[in-house]
Curated annotation (Swiss-Prot):
SUPFAM superfamilies: Tetraspanin. Keywords: Cell adhesion, Cell projection, Disulfide bond, Membrane, Sensory transduction, Transmembrane, Transmembrane helix, Vision. It is a multi-pass membrane protein. Residues 325-351 are annotated as: Disordered. It is found in: Photoreceptor inner segment membrane; Photoreceptor outer segment membrane. It comes from Bos taurus (Bovine). Its main location: membrane. GO terms for cellular component: cell projection; plasma membrane. The keyword Transmembrane applies. This is Rod outer segment membrane protein 1.
Amino acid sequence: MAPVLPLVLPLQPRIRLAQGLWLLSWLLVLVGGLTLLCSGHLLVQLWHLGTFLAPSCPFSALPQVALAASAVALGTGLVGSGASRASLDAEQYPPWRGVLGPLLVAGTAGGGGLLVLALGLALALPGTLDTGLEEGLGSALVHYKDTEVPGRCQAKRLLDELQLRHHCCGRHGYKDWFGIQWVSNRYLDPNDPDVVDRIQSNVEGLYLIDGVPFSCCNPHSPRPCLQSQLSDPHAHPLFDPRQPNLNLWSQGCHEVLLGHLQGLASTLGNMLAVTFLLQTLVLLGLRYLQTALEGLGGVIDGEGEAQGYLFPAGLKDMLKTAWLQGAGPHRPAPGETPPEEKPPKECLPEA
């Protein structure tokens, strides 16, 4: 049974392999740590912006899986640096001989699987942000006025902070506020004819105005912020709703948050790809180094050439060996049964 992808390693290539693995492992530690920070940053951002994402949006799974994958990659890099450094010393390597094989299996199956899953999520999940933000921001705008409703008390504060921090207004623009009631009934006078007319002017019985909350105002504008009667061209002669202006934020929060979160997801996806490449190289190098040293009794500077490989035999041979070992002692087929020898006849005594 021939080994899979064998590689002959003389003395100097073995030493260079161990030294290169040590540098590559520390590079994996660095990249894994940066990926860990990127995952944590995206997770914190989603924790702050979770109110504006639909509960059914699965995007939050990306930083969680990426966090676990980067932590395993960081651990793989630390193991690789320790094992490659110890392989250069015949006295330090023996403790690694018994644990390096299981660690390689765990790193390949666990770490590789998590990285592949995280990369798949980084490619697939950003597309779900569009509908998730659309639904979440729409719900946030509707509940802006519910400052006294249990469970919705913080909706106004969170949306005001969002618009001020990200320089956005409404879901797709400031006109989104015209179609919802964002003033609480607590502050409306039911005896005011204007209030009654506005409530009776729509079938839903909402108090709709052509104004926006204060958080839509640009504090850096040189002019006073115009918040009411924005659709009346005669109310504010200097304000033209058809032209860009400095008073209100021009972008909607959907566009701003979508670009922000997709940018973070893209950065995280690139970091995961680099981490996957480095982890693959480290695991392959460790496997070749381990199998080469096993042929030399764990001594890297042993005499002669050593052969490193990925698997001691092909997949078919490995499965056949495992099957034979699990099936117990071999029982020959009926055609293979050797003929039984007849017992020798006993000689009768002569009379």
